[in-house]
Amino acid sequence: MSFNDTQEQFAPNMALVPMVIEQTSRGERSYDIYSRLLKERIIFLTGQVEDHMANLIVAQMLFLEAENPEKDINLYINSPGGVITAGMSIYDTMQYIKADVSTICMGQACSMGAFLLSAGAKGKRICLPNSRVMIHQPLGGYQGQATDIQIHAQEILKVKSRMNELMAQHTGKSIEEIERDTERDRFLSANEALEYGLVDKVYTQRS
C-alpha cells in the first residue's frame, strides 16, 4: 500500500473489453462483459487501486445496494495493491452499505488488495486455490522541508496504526501480531490465508 497520492503511474486499463449480445423481446442488446456481470451483482477489482478505479467500484456498490439492499454483492479481487486513500474509500463503502459484500481472490490480493479481501462479510471471504496473498505495512515517501517530512511521517504512523486495528478486527489476530507480521512483506498461499483469518474458505470449484 502506498501512502503517496500521486496517480501518474496508475493509468486506467485501456485493453479491449469483450462484448456480450443478448436476445430480448425487443431484439438484440449488447453489453460490455463487465456491465453484463454487474447485472449478476459481480464487480471486478483488478489492477492498481487508485482514485479512478476506486470511484467506479464505489459507484457500482452503491448502485447495487439501491437496486436490492438484501442481496449479496460479489467483489472479485486480482490486485497488487495501490493508494491507501483510494482503497479506504472502497473499504468504507463495503462497511457502509446494507448488502453483504462477498470477496473472492483470484490471482493475487496484495497490500491494499489483501486488506479489502479481509474486509468482506464474515463467512463470505473466499480464495481460489492458486491465489497469492501478501500483507505488509504502508509504504510512503516524501521530499521537502524537515518539518513537513516530520508531519507526513506522523500521519503515516497514524494510518499504519489504524489499518493494524482494522486488520486485527477482520482476522481475529491481535494488533501486536498484525504489527509483527506486516513489518516486512509476508506472502501467503490460499490455505495460509485461510489459517491466518484473511479468508473463510478456499474453493476449487463452485459449490
Curated annotation (Swiss-Prot):
InterPro entries referenced in this protein's UniProt entry, alphabetically: ClpP, ClpP/crotonase-like_dom_sf, ClpP/TepA, ClpP_His_AS, ClpP_Ser_AS
EC code(s) of this entry: 3.4.21.92
Catalysed reactions, as listed in the record: Hydrolysis of proteins to small peptides in the presence of ATP and magnesium. alpha-casein is the usual test substrate. In the absence of ATP, only oligopeptides shorter than five residues are hydrolyzed (such as succinyl-Leu-Tyr-|-NHMec, and Leu-Tyr-Leu-|-Tyr-Trp, in which cleavage of the -Tyr-|-Leu- and -Tyr-|-Trp bonds also occurs)
Pfam hit, one: CLP_protease
Disulfide feature: none
BP terms from Gene Ontology: protein quality control for misfolded or incompletely synthesized proteins
Keyword Protease: yes
CC annotations in GO: cytoplasm; endopeptidase Clp complex
PROSITE patterns: CLP_PROTEASE_HIS (PS00382), CLP_PROTEASE_SER (PS00381)
Function comment: Cleaves peptides in various proteins in a process that requires ATP hydrolysis. Has a chymotrypsin-like activity. Plays a major role in the degradation of misfolded proteins.
Entry similarity comment: Belongs to the peptidase S14 family.
Protein name according to UniProt: ATP-dependent Clp protease proteolytic subunit
Protein source organism: Proteus mirabilis (strain HI4320)
Organism phylogeny: Bacteria, Pseudomonadati, Pseudomonadota, Gammaproteobacteria, Enterobacterales
